[in-house]
Every structure is written in C-alpha cells, then in structure tokens.
Design a protein with these regions (language model features):
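Conserved ABC transporter NBD signature motif
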Residues: 69-78, 85-89
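Conserved catalytic motifs of ABC-family nucleotide-binding domains
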Residues: 51, 98-110, 177-179
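Catalytic Walker B motif of ABC-type/P-loop ATPase nucleotide-binding domains
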Residues: 170-174
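Conserved ABC nucleotide-binding domain
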Residues: 132-151
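A short, proline-enriched helix->beta-strand linker immediately N-terminal to the Walker B motif
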Residues: 162-168
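ABC-type ATPase nucleotide-binding domains, specifically the catalytic core motifs of the NBD
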Residues: 108-123
Length: 191
C-alpha cells in the first residue's frame, strides 16, 4: 500500500500459501509450505526430489488439495476446494512433453480450445496469430503445422496459448533439458 503522493508500487499477489501441508497417502511431503507468487514476476523453485515437484505442480493445477494451512488466490483467502477450482482456470504447465496437437495448425492449437466459439474461424485465427507475432516480436519463419516445429518453437506456441487463455501463472517444467542455452534465452526474453 502507498502513501498519498508516493508512487504506486503495489504488487498484485496471485497466490499465497502459508503453512501449507500436502500429503501423499499418510506421508507428509510438504509440512510447512510457504509461497508467494506475484503478477509479472518470474520465480524459480528447486525441489529435493521428483515426488515433491510432481505434487507441487499438481497442487498448482488444482489436482491436489492442501491438507492444512492457508491459501489466498488473487489476494482473497479461499477454501481448499475453491482455490483448486480457481487454480485449474489460472495455471498452465509447459513441460518437456508438448501438449500441442501435432496434426493441426499452430493457430488452431492456440485458439481452438481457448475460444468460446462453436465453430472454427481459421481466417480469424491466422489474423490473431499474426497480430500476436507482431505484438511479441516472434519470427515469421515457423512451420505451419505443429509436427514440424522445433522444441523451442513448441514452447513458444504453448506460451502464446497460455497468454491467449489469460493464464495468470505459467509453470515451465524442466524445459532446460529440451532447449539449448541460446533457445532458452530466446524463450525467457519472450516471457
């Protein structure tokens, strides 16, 4: 919060977990999880093992509920079930295995399931994709079909899809194993 006359520099909190506990069966995996994610910030998280990482991502996707603790989504305290529902709508995961459909166009992958329309409008999709490319300074030399994209291009298209779907939290899950240092730099400059 700010004083009158001072510049407004309040960060918008997307997610806050205080004293969170996550269990797998009878085993407590996270005993005192605390996390704050803010709009416009990039946060790196390192895990001790793959089970922790998977449960954490599943929790952010709304597939695993906190066992105890407090959770705030968009600066409002929520019950665990409500938080999970909101997180399902607001979180995207981009990982080493692409979720893009290889047999359809890039444009269809970006807009088809994010649109609320009942019918495809490929002309509109092409125009919207071109606008996104221009707006975000993305190269025009990508192949038309997803199956012909490089790993970097797939990550970029998945980022565009998350952007178009207005996802508030985007998780990049182990993309460093997919991309060269140069490609990783290009992806992070887009972000």
């Amino acid at each position: 919060h700010y004083k009158q006359g001072a510049e407004k520099s309040v960060k918008r909190e997307l997610l806050n977990i205080e004293g969170g506990k996550i269990k797998k069966g009878n085993n407590v995996i996270f005993d005192d999880l605390s996390l704050e994610l803010f709009q416009g910030e990039i946060t790196g998280i390192v895990f001790d093992d793959i089970l922790e990482q998977k449960l954490f991502i599943d929790m952010l996707l709304g597939d695993v509920l906190l066992y105890s603790g407090k959770i705030f989504v968009n600066e409002e305290r929520k019950a665990y079930e409500e938080a999970a529902r909101l997180l399902k709508q607001q979180v995207a995961v981009i990982g080493s295995k692409s979720k893009l459909l290889p047999s359809i166009t890039i444009e269809d992958n970006i807009f088809l399931f994010s649109d609320r329309k009942l019918f495809l409008d490929q002309k509109e999709y092409r125009e919207r994709f071109q606008k996104l490319r221009t707006e975000l300074n993305i190269s025009d030399d990508m192949p038309h079909k997803v199956r012909n994209l490089s790993a970097k291009e797939k990550v970029i298209i998945e980022l565009l899809k998350a952007y178009e779907e207005r996802k508030k939290i985007v998780i990049l899950d182990e993309i460093t194993s997919l991309l060269s240092e140069k490609d990783l730099g290009e992806v992070f400059s887009l972000i």
